[in-house]
Amino acid sequence: MKLLVVGSGGREHAIAKKLLESKDVEKVFVAPGNDGMTLDGLELVNISISEHSKLIDFAKTNDVAWTFIGPDDALAAGIVDDFNQAGLKAFGPTRAAAELEWSKDFAKEIMVKYGVSTAAYGTFSDFEEAKAYIEKHGAPIVVKADGLALGKGVVVAETVEQAVEAAHEMLLDNKFGDSGARVVIEEFLEGEEFSLFAFVNGDKFYIMPTAQDHKRAYDGDKGPNTGGMGAYAPVPHLPQSVVDTAVDTIVKPVLEGIIKEGRPYLGVIYAGLILTADGPKVIEFNSRFGDPETQIILPRLTSDFAQNITDILDGKEPNIMWTDKGVTLGVVVASKGYPLDYERGVELPAKTEGDVITYYAGAKFAENSRALLSNGGRVYMLVTTADTVKEAQASIYQELSQQKIEGLFYRTDIGSKAIK
């Protein structure tokens, strides 16, 4: 069968590469993809994620069995609704179900209504009211754009002044456009963060290995928030009992709640959680695979990925299997200046071979050669699996030390939290 993946980043590279490994898959198209993906035999389609009718026409013309939707903004724009209306199968939630991600206020309302543990909060569209709330509650405090902001719409403010400035930028300076026209301001939760993903169809869900992302740009969790600078899975120091509690008290009630709201969920759900002294609590929900977590979770899948998704789409019980070997760790290489202004056009090192996988996020061929150049904030990610976090770290950082990456940067401490 032929499949289509919608999106262009490292997440979509990992999804498409894994699908192509399946025995019944002859071709995987990626729209629009990036040039680095072609090194893994993936076929790029020059259609933007916002051009739903063109994507639908392409899927029909090329006998695509089903389409996997990668990015949040495509889901928020109702791409799954449009595919379904055209009689095509797409793996991802409808616009209504995806509101769990594209409106933080809606997600909070669902959590409160169905008794899911999360931070105390207030939602504001008026700056003076937001400012008064911040001054009343003090710092540290968290200010979030209500809508989608490429993973950069969250400010963990350590002072009242910083929080007020963040609210001002979103509500009055229009920093994130309509996405920041409302802000959710919530209490700062202390604890260790982790990510929990599941494949979902209605009230049936299948949990994936836990993962830990590294959001800040620089070592020691310093600098601005990014889309993610590296991750590892599973989280070895996280007890299974915590995962079980999170499934029973967070994932299950939210999925049951969203059915009761008339918005049944199909696709991948991603719970960004924090283990507090009072147990796991929700930081956020996302309505799709995470980036960079996808790149370190999917290499751990030992079953046939395309068959698993086909079964879920058809309402059958999928036979999903994961390796229990060690840990999978990945480090993102980004353009200098990311997540703010950055340059493009830096020549990239050759694709890795053997045990270290390269997933490309922002790469394009030079005009007159097959040299790959940087073409985005996050450029590529190196991923490997080893018996321990320490061994995986050593392998990745050894590889990176040999790569010529002037004009690019990476964090040198991915996974260090797991080494006690």
Swiss-Prot record:
Cofactor: Mg(2+); Mn(2+)
Pathways involved: Purine metabolism; IMP biosynthesis via de novo pathway; N(1)-(5-phospho-D-ribosyl)glycinamide from 5-phospho-alpha-D-ribose 1-diphosphate: step 2/2
UniProt cross-references to InterPro entries, sorted A to Z: ATP-grasp, ATP_grasp_subdomain_1, PreATP-grasp_dom_sf, PRibGlycinamid_synth_ATP-grasp, PRibGlycinamide_synth, PRibGlycinamide_synth_C-dom, PRibGlycinamide_synth_C_sf, PRibGlycinamide_synth_CS
Keywords noted in UniProt: ATP-binding, Ligase, Magnesium, Manganese, Metal-binding, Nucleotide-binding, Purine biosynthesis
Binding-site residues for ATP, renumbered to this chain: 134-195
SUPFAM superfamilies assigned: Glutathione synthetase ATP-binding domain-like, PreATP-grasp domain, Rudiment single hybrid motif
Domain of life: Bacteria
Domain ATP-grasp residues, every copy: 108-314
GO annotation terms (biological process): 'de novo' IMP biosynthetic process; purine nucleobase biosynthetic process
EC top class, as a word: ligase
Record text on cofactor binding: Binds 1 Mg(2+) or Mn(2+) ion per subunit.
One Gene Ontology MF term: phosphoribosylamine-glycine ligase activity
Entry's EC annotation: 6.3.4.13
Positions annotated to bind Mg(2+): E284, N286
The reaction(s) this protein catalyses: 5-phospho-beta-D-ribosylamine + glycine + ATP = N(1)-(5-phospho-beta-D-ribosyl)glycinamide + ADP + phosphate + H(+)
Annotated HAMAP family: GARS (MF_00138)
Family to which this protein belongs: Belongs to the GARS family.
Protein name: Phosphoribosylamine--glycine ligase
Organism field: Streptococcus pneumoniae (strain ATCC BAA-255 / R6)
Gene this protein is translated from: purD
